[in-house]
Each structure stands twice: as structure tokens, then as C-alpha cells.
């Protein structure tokens, strides 16, 4: 297996709430390992905290079926680019923040390539989409919860 780099962590926060949550964690991670480069998808808060953005979170922030359909080609292109760049870069870790419909497929491919995966904000499985638990098991090494 290829060696992982120790100098980058890839973040993917594609919503305003994810940008906020990640901005509460990213500075602590960066302070604990000053040599780490933080890069990926984030919003203004994460960028202010040192994220080198590949894409801005606003490019993924869509609501309603029609808006999703209209922006779907761009969203899928961003997803493919995140997978490609992450696997090629071999970062120390990939951290997906919420947005499970976007992140879980990326996380599954990234983890299969041997890169450790953390997912912040556990996706709902109890109320609906209970089958999602199987994808989470395949995709994620560590799942961070915001509620007990």
C-alpha cells in the first residue's frame, strides 16, 4: 500500500452548519499539529481558520428538488474531484462533516484506498433509511456525535 502523507488533512463541509461545526474543531487540530495542511471543502469560517479551499461550501449548498437537479452536474463533478484528489494526495485523514448524501460515497472510496476516515455528525439511521448503517460501517473509521 502507498504511504500516507503526514502533512495534510482533507475536510469536506458542504453546508453552512457543517462549516460552523468544523470551525469549532479545525483550529484545535491545526494547533496540535502545526505542520498539517488543512484543505478541501469549507465555508468562510473554515477558510478564516486556515482551510485551503479546493471548493467553497456554497457550491454544494442547494435546497429543494429543482435546485438539486439543476446543480447536480456540478455537485457530481465536485464529488469526483474530491475522490480523485484525496486518493492521489494520500492525506493523513479525510474528515467529512455532516452532508451524508455527499460525503458517505466519498468516504467509502477514500477508506477503501487505505486513508483513515472520520465523519462528524452521525447521519440519521433510526427514523428513516436504516439501511444506511451498512454504508456507514464500510465508509467510516471514526464517527463523531454531537448528541449522546
What residues fall within each predicted segment?
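Phosphate-coordination loops involved in phosphoryl transfer and adenosine-cofactor binding
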Residues: 4-6
Amino acid at each position: 500500500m502507498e504511504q500516507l502523507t503526514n502533512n495534510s488533512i482533507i475536510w469536506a463541509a458542504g453546508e453552512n452548519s457543517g462549516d460552523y461545526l468544523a470551525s469549532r474543531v479545525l483550529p484545535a487540530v491545526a494547533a496540535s499539529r502545526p505542520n498539517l495542511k488543512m484543505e478541501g471543502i469549507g465555508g468562510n469560517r473554515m477558510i478564516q481558520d486556515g482551510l485551503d479551499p479546493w471548493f467553497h461550501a456554497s457550491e454544494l449548498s442547494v435546497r429543494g428538488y429543482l435546485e438539486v437537479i439543476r446543480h447536480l452536474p456540478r455537485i457530481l463533478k465536485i464529488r469526483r474531484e474530491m475522490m480523485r484528489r484525496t486518493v492521489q494526495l494520500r492525506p493523513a485523514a479525510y474528515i467529512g462533516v455532516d452532508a451524508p448524501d455527499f460525503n458517505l460515497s466519498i468516504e467509502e472510496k477514500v477508506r477503501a484506498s487505505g486513508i483513515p476516515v472520520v465523519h462528524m455528525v452521525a447521519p440519521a439511521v433510526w427514523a428513516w433509511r436504516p439501511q444506511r448503517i451498512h454504508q456507514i460501517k464500510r465508509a467510516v473509521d471514526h464517527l463523531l456525535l454531537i448528541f449522546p
